[in-house]
Amino acid sequence: MLLADVNLFIYAHRPESPRFDEHKAWLTTALSGDEPFGISEQILSGFLRIVTNHRVFRDPTPPDVALDFCQTVLTAPSAVRIRPGREHWRIFENLCRELGARGNVIPDAFLAAMAIEVGATFITTDAGFARFPGLRWRRPFDTNPGRR
């Protein structure tokens, strides 16, 4: 199973994003592939928060357009909704304690714990996720997941 970070959705949605065409093609292929693609509502809400924000984008995405994008993702053939389960908090707490996590590392630890709990490979352009022990992660165009 794959679980994508918010940056993948942003880069596949906003044409001015780095490597937009490649990210869009990657996401389209992944969402229609054979491997289950985990969708976290928390990650999608982060996508909505960022792409509709006029402080982030001069011309932010209209909310209806952003919500339609989310609906397309949620109803894709490979999409599987992922929510924190019974072990999530324990994994999250252990990651936070082990790393002395604070500030902006906390939400990343929360997502890493979700991926670890369901055994997903976390797809992100943020190499900072390498800090989380037990997390399999990779960049979208890499084929070999790293285990850190």
Report residues per predicted region.
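Acidic, PIN/NYN-like endoribonuclease modules and their adjacent C-terminal/linker elements
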Residues: 1, 112-148
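Short, well-structured N-terminal submotif of metal-dependent ribonuclease cores
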Residues: 1-39, 55-68, 118, 146-147
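Alpha-helix capping/helix-boundary segments
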Residues: 8, 43, 87-88, 110-111, ...
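Short beta-strand segments at enzyme active-site cores
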Residues: 38-41, 125
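Short, hydrophobic secondary-structure boundary micro-motifs
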Residues: 39-40, 60, 81-84, 141
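Short, hinge-like loop/turn segments at secondary-structure boundaries
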Residues: 54-57, 99-100, 140-143
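Active-site neighborhoods of divalent-metal-dependent phosphate/nucleic-acid chemistry enzymes
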Residues: 78-123
